């Protein structure tokens, strides 16, 4: 399998985003989004997905964080799709349950080529620090649309909003890792009866 590395830049009048991902990395992350709590969540994806991930973002945070968070999701999705290439030889499906104290979340992903998000999370409060938790849904929608994956995210329980978010992002990383992992029994084969994804 060739190197699974991609770098994508996205520049609009609202944001400038750069993402670099190595799917066969060591879990190293570098983040500068202007949103410290989002940086913390993205670091969970790198570490638990065991991917090397660099994200630099400049956005219109003087308005709010919506454009920046959504566009990071979009650009990460584009980078993921590019790094995966034709998806031959991967496992395709991934899932993870992750607990953190009282919180428990489940994430299931399918590198199907069909964008779809089922996001079922009721945060116990609207903000974590100064971060608007509604924006996590925008992040995942942007990712799904541009990675062309089906993604199910369910928070099963949790009273602490920080714990809820962290379990989601850790499970997201672990599910991505499982789905993108090379399957030695599928070398050179697309994991679909259609012959393409």
From Swiss-Prot:
Q: Does the keyword Amino-acid biosynthesis apply?
A: yes
InterPro entries per UniProt: IGPD_sf, ImidazoleglycerolP_deHydtase, ImidazoleglycerP_deHydtase_CS, Ribosomal_Su5_D2-typ_SF
One Pfam family cited in the UniProt record for this chain: IGPD
* Reaction it catalyzes: D-erythro-1-(imidazol-4-yl)glycerol 3-phosphate = 3-(imidazol-4-yl)-2-oxopropyl phosphate + H2O
Enumerate the CDD domains for this protein. Answer: IGPD
> Which compartment or compartments is the protein found in?
Cytoplasm
Q: Which GO terms describe its biological process?
A: L-histidine biosynthetic process
Per UniProt, which keywords does this protein have?
Answer: Amino-acid biosynthesis, Cytoplasm, Histidine biosynthesis, Lyase
> EC?
4.2.1.19
Q: What is its main location?
A: cytoplasm
Note the Gene3D superfamilies from the entry: Imidazole glycerol phosphate dehydratase, domain 1
Give the record's GO CC terms: cytoplasm
Q: Name one GO molecular function term.
A: imidazoleglycerol-phosphate dehydratase activity
Q: In which pathway does it act?
A: Amino-acid biosynthesis; L-histidine biosynthesis; L-histidine from 5-phospho-alpha-D-ribose 1-diphosphate: step 6/9
Question: Per its UniProt record, what HAMAP family does this chain match?
Answer: HisB (MF_00076)
The family assignment reads: Belongs to the imidazoleglycerol-phosphate dehydratase family.
User: What is this protein identified as?
Assistant: Imidazoleglycerol-phosphate dehydratase
Give the organism the record lists: Thioalkalivibrio sulfidiphilus (strain HL-EbGR7)
């Amino acid at each position: 399998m060739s190197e699974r590395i991609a770098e994508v830049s996205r520049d609009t009048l609202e944001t400038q985003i750069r993402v670099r991902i190595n799917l066969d990395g060591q879990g190293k992350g570098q983040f500068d989004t202007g949103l410290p709590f989002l940086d913390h969540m993205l670091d969970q994806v790198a570490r638990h997905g065991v991917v090397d991930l660099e994200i630099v973002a400049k956005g219109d945070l003087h308005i709010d964080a919506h454009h920046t968070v959504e566009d990071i999701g979009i650009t990460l999705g584009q980078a993921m799709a590019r790094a995966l290439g034709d998806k031959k030889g991967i496992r395709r499906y991934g899932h993870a349950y992750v607990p953190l104290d009282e919180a428990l979340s489940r994430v299931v992903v399918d590198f199907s080529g069909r964008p779809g998000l089922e996001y079922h999370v009721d945060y116990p409060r609207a903000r974590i620090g100064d971060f608007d938790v509604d924006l996590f849904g925008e992040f995942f929608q942007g990712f799904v649309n541009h990675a062309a994956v089906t993604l199910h995210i369910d928070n099963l329980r949790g009273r602490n909003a920080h714990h809820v978010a962290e379990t989601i992002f850790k499970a997201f990383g672990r599910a991505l890792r499982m789905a993108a992992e090379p399957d030695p029994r599928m070398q050179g084969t697309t994991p679909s009866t259609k012959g393409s994804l």
